[in-house]
Amino acid sequence: MKKTGLLLALCLLTTGAFAQADQSSPAGTVATNVNFPAEAIATPTQSDLYCAGFVNKSLLPNATYVAGGLDTPNTTQFSDGGELIYLAGKSYTLGQRYRVVRELKDPNRRELFNGQDAMLKVMGQPYADLAIVRVVDTRSRMAVAHIELSCAPILPGDIVADFAEKSPIAFHPSMKFDRFAPSNGKAGGRIVLAKDFDSELGTGMKVYMNLGSNQGIKVGDYFRAFRSYEADLHNPVDSLSFKASTAEDTQAKPPSIEKNMLTKSSGPTIHVADLPRRAVGEIVVLDVTPTTSTGMIVFAMEDMHLGDGVELDPQ
């Protein structure tokens, strides 16, 4: 009798737990740790904020630039904290901080998804963040500055720009990640470029997206990155897997994927467009311009790709 009562109580508790889970999950879903995995969101550091790079609609003035350093000409790269460098140009303020950036070009000159070049032309010019420096001497024709924060080696000719403090991104608690969330109708765009011209992207990496403050985007907003299977179908590499056989010798009627005369089979036809889009990760906005956003990948279920879609994710 005691055993029966114990089993009944256990059944009631289990039923209650499932009911509670169903109430907290979106309509049309049963939440499990597979389709709603827990996401541990990374918090951006000071280096993440100030070393992310950016894409700017217009070119930055280049009248102020790095001319050399204490050990010129024997040293042509400057990166150590506290290292002294010389700044050419006018209007430097003693004790003021400045930002050292580099106007970039892609040495590969190859589109990684259709339309990338056209999107980038609309977005503007990519820049790398190299360092934050402070002017310590203005008695000569060139100002002397020391490096306070180094992101990457500085070279002669790199641009010196005004510095602005950035607000830290608040810690984000862990939450459930909806892998198959449909479009929410919020502002959306694409990952067009990544820092260092990377193409396979994961947690901690920086990306540049083609929407900004003109679309209401602000620092601290979160984007959900997603990919459709149609994108894989049109990718020169990923599409090879769609073309490979999925059949097994014991399968009487194997299916066709996007059936045509060459791939016709006696089984059902699978239309790639009917497969659900899948969410691949979360991106937090570190910086915005009117037409672009710089983001950091703070959670990734799989590699993100250039060309992946992004959609504003109300947290």
PLM feature segments, named:
Residues 2-5, 18-315:
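Surface-exposed, polar/charged interaction patches used for macromolecular assembly or partner binding
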Residues 7-15:
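Bacterial N-terminal signal peptides
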